[in-house]
């Protein structure tokens, strides 16, 4: 028995289980105020996209939407705000591991939406990947419930008054109104960010595929990993939810531009100045560089990328390629090659291992796509596929929501309105010619703002010209060629570490993007005061703040828990000699002219031989390091923000002021019970940042930097 056949059999078993459960419960649950509740009334029937059969109903009628928000603010928000970024990050990682362990259940449910295994992988494991990615961001954040943003700002000549920026979690809830195409990824990519920031979420998935979102939320709730109130789910209408949001809440929307604009203009959103992030479907494009010819690797890369983006998820992706721009002298060749690739696409029941493209999410979606294609045909013609018929495997083409891939041709892109304004949200794309790169840039902008654009070229000049010209109208631009194609994540894949969103029609919003996304859920407040007061507030030592005299106790003798922000020592002095500089030059091999005593310094920035900056830093380490006895400091972890502010000449004495700046606890690595623990492979520890100030014998700063050490803990976390 083949592996793929076994997978199919397992799918059928799980699918039967899922359908049985749904038939027994009749309606999807809504998880609100800590319990599962069914809405009143029959609600909306939800269908199997492949068989056309009813699988369940969804309704939110009778639910207390105002109460949901209040519960999120009072329960979820208060619990999350008490957790540090490190704790929230570990929570996300635990949730990701739990969901990954349950993923086959989700794959079984995903089949109901018409998704193939590959389609579902993007949605399910791609969504879980967002949890892992955001969990790892904790390493860039403090071990606090808040964070500082940017650098300290000196506001006085005498260094007694300064400013900084503070980030704290908003006191409301994140309301996520999501699209139907990615019921798992759409939820997880958003809640991963707000949970790390310290805000709870109310998720409203698109009703048509909300059964898959509900299945995932049931596992999240069952895990007990999230604090009470951190996540609520409504399957069906959002009712009057937006009438009760306030300025401490954040609303996000993913879907059509028309629906998004209506929600964005909600009277309460405007009256309360509620942050609203909109990510709308857009007319994304791909450009074949004029340098690319048949036989080049980039030619095949282009053709395959178009085919992939037209058929994965049956073209139901907000990032899918809707417009294809090719040099006018290559239009016929490219069209034939895309035609040939699309002809290889097998369509039908996703449970059949031969199928490469499944159904649209439902009959309603298929009719909407057909309607939009009719509009496109006002200025274009179909050169591949049919609106009315499609050959399918193990399914009924009329009962299921199946549609043929449709490649349209438009030969007058500058004069035509439809290809740049009408989106058919399915396996549909329009190919159009251009004369030169400037034309391609202009055509790309006719989409009035897009989530993503790709240019396939081997020419760096063409790539640069296109990127610089098109960047104003795109949230992301992929430059694809033979060098990166094998490892490229592709045109249609937003990544958690990069921003997702776009200007204009694409919604004007921005989500994900690593720490950039987290800050959408944090209030940034400017704080002012003395350096010592800002240090006390932030738990990060600020320049010119008062230090804590450790007396005879060197801070390197303290365990992580014993160290206090502001612990400080001032070292003895060391005389820097010409002989020291010569020896360091020989030892390091750095014989830069400024470090050679025989140099003619007449036309230089220096008076005489000057010490290497790295020698001064090394000499500083010799002054502040407690070198003799074994102590809790495990190792030197690195240097941040090192600056040499004044030349040090032979005959100058230097000394160091050494201050505990910041502490970040680290969790122990998970032990494998089947592998014997090796001493030294991991011990309880944390990262300690030290503020190092190097002064000369005039008490003027010669250097400043932050060094990082790994320091042992007394206790595990």
Tell where the protein language model's regions lie, with residue ranges.
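Hydrophobic beta-strand-centered segment that forms part of the acyl-chain substrate-binding groove
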Residues: 602-611, 615-664, 671
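ALDH superfamily catalytic-core signature
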Residues: 222-224, 250, 259-414, 438, ...
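N-terminal Rossmann-like NAD(P)+-binding subdomain of aldehyde/semialdehyde dehydrogenases
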Residues: 18-159, 344, 361, 370, ...
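Short, well-ordered beta-strand elements within core beta-sheets of diverse protein domains
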Residues: 54-61, 76-81, 155, 175-176, ...
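Conserved C-terminal structural/oligomerization subdomain of aldehyde/semialdehyde dehydrogenase
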Residues: 50-57, 225-228, 247-250, 340, ...
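HotDog/MaoC-like acyl-thioester-processing domains
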Residues: 555-565, 644, 648-717
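Catalytic strand-loop segment that frames the active site of acyl-thioester-processing enzymes
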Residues: 551-611, 713
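Rossmann-like NAD(P) dinucleotide-binding subdomain of oxidoreductase/dehydrogenase enzymes
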Residues: 142-301, 434, 487, 509
